[in-house]
Amino acid sequence: MTMTTMPESLNSPVSGKAVFMEFGPPNQQMSPSPMSHGHYSMHCLHSAGHSQPDGAYSSASSFSRPLGYPYVNSVSSHASSPYISSVQSYPGSASLAQSRLEDPGADSEKSTVVEGGEVRFNGKGKKIRKPRTIYSSLQLQALNRRFQQTQYLALPERAELAASLGLTQTQVKIWFQNKRSKFKKLMKQGGAALEGSALANGRALSAGSPPVPPGWNPNSSSGKGSGGNAGSYIPSYTSWYPSAHQEAMQQPQLM
């Protein structure tokens, strides 16, 4: 009984319909419906960003339950869309962007334009050293004469001096600044040298001073010699002033 009932149950048309309804027809499993194909191709031209979800939904709607492989088949079947072909037609865009990122300072290495001839910077921010100004002998003589008159110049004076010497105002200003700094250094060095020489002279005078003359010796025993010597060194000014005795005699007479 069991052997005969099993084939009958398998060969029954109801069971076959259930199996085919569960898995679907083989043609629909292998390729999506033509309606979903047309819908995907038309929608891909308008909105490329939403083409893949619409294709997945349209292909999955023809089945009893959603499967993973119809989405893959729909994408692979429409690989020749205009959007994908346009992306694949520019393979060098990524390399071009990478080369630009690797070399960001190619355009910034150019030096900037000089403004006023005072400050110049290149693309990296480093200051470019300007060429040193070479003054002629006549210009140096005129500048030195003016520096002896005054160490600071007003704007009109500086402009006039620069025009007369054929220089710019910036060159004249820088020359006066350098000259003032050198002059201050020389003054400091000269003051230190004068102080050192004064100290050296004081030490030499204290070490090599002459001895005290014998007339000024307080321990001398001879009064005449000391008096004579004292008279020779200190003149007597008693004749210029009246003595105390004469003043005392004149006071009662005035009374």
UniProtKB/Swiss-Prot annotation:
The keyword Zinc does not apply. Expressed in hematopoietic cell lines. It holds the Pfam family Homeodomain. Residues 128-187 bind DNA. Residues 100-112 have a biased composition (Basic and acidic residues). SUPFAM superfamilies: Homeodomain-like (SSF46689). Residues 25-36 have a biased composition (Low complexity). Residues 1-38, 95-118, 204-230 are annotated as: Disordered. GO terms for cellular component: chromatin; cytosol; intracellular membrane-bounded organelle; nucleoplasm; nucleus. Disulfide bonds: none annotated. One of its GO terms (molecular function) is sequence-specific double-stranded DNA binding. Its main location: nucleus. PROSITE patterns: HOMEOBOX_1, HOMEOBOX_2. Transmembrane segments: none annotated. GO terms for biological process: cell differentiation; cellular response to BMP stimulus; cellular response to transforming growth factor beta stimulus; cerebral cortex GABAergic interneuron fate commitment; embryonic skeletal system development; hippocampus development; negative regulation of BMP signaling pathway; negative regulation of cellular response to transforming growth factor beta stimulus. It comes from the Eukaryota. It is found in: Nucleus. Keywords: Activator, Developmental protein, Differentiation, DNA-binding, Homeobox, Nucleus, Repressor, Transcription, Transcription regulation. The keyword Cytoplasm does not apply. Residues 1-14 have a biased composition (Polar residues). Interacts with SMAD4 (via homeobox DNA-binding domain). Interacts (via homeobox DNA-binding domain) with POU4F2; this interaction suppresses DLX1-mediated transcriptional activity in postnatal retina and enhances retinal ganglion cell (RGC) differentiation. Belongs to the distal-less homeobox family. The homeobox DNA-binding domain is necessary for its nuclear localization, transcriptional and erythroid differentiation activities. PANTHER family: HOMEOBOX PROTEIN, HOMEOBOX PROTEIN DLX-1. Plays a role as a transcriptional activator or repressor. Inhibits several cytokine signaling pathways, such as TGFB1, activin-A/INHBA and BMP4 by interfering with the transcriptional stimulatory activity of transcription factors, such as MSX2, FAST2, SMAD2 and SMAD3 during hematopoietic cell differentiation. Plays a role in terminal differentiation of interneurons, such as amacrine and bipolar cells in the developing retina. Likely to play a regulatory role in the development of the ventral forebrain. This is Homeobox protein DLX-1. It comes from Homo sapiens.
